[in-house]
Amino acid sequence: MFQKALPALLRSDKVLKRAADANVEQSDFDTSLKDAADTIDKIRNAGPGVGQSELSDRIGDLLLSIVNASRIAGVNSEESLNYATKKFINRFELQEQMASVKDAE
């Protein structure tokens, strides 16, 4: 029914779009963001003693809410994540270069 060979981000976007097209998923942008915020609160309130399985489940829910908000807003979540990763890499490489210069002094 749903391709499992796709990367998780792309797969979740396609599943959410299909659910929306079938009128199964009725959430709007604000609801998706509220779902994400609620999930963050659950993760935060669970504390450090929460099990890995429960934490993994909640983070998965968070990611799905974010992908849904992106889809509703017409933003390609794959491209957004790639761009954010590229920005992080640029900052990280700059920090490495600055540390290298400082070590050389």
Protein language model features and the residues they cover:
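Flexible "arm" and connector segments at domain edges
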Residues: M1-I59, L63-E105
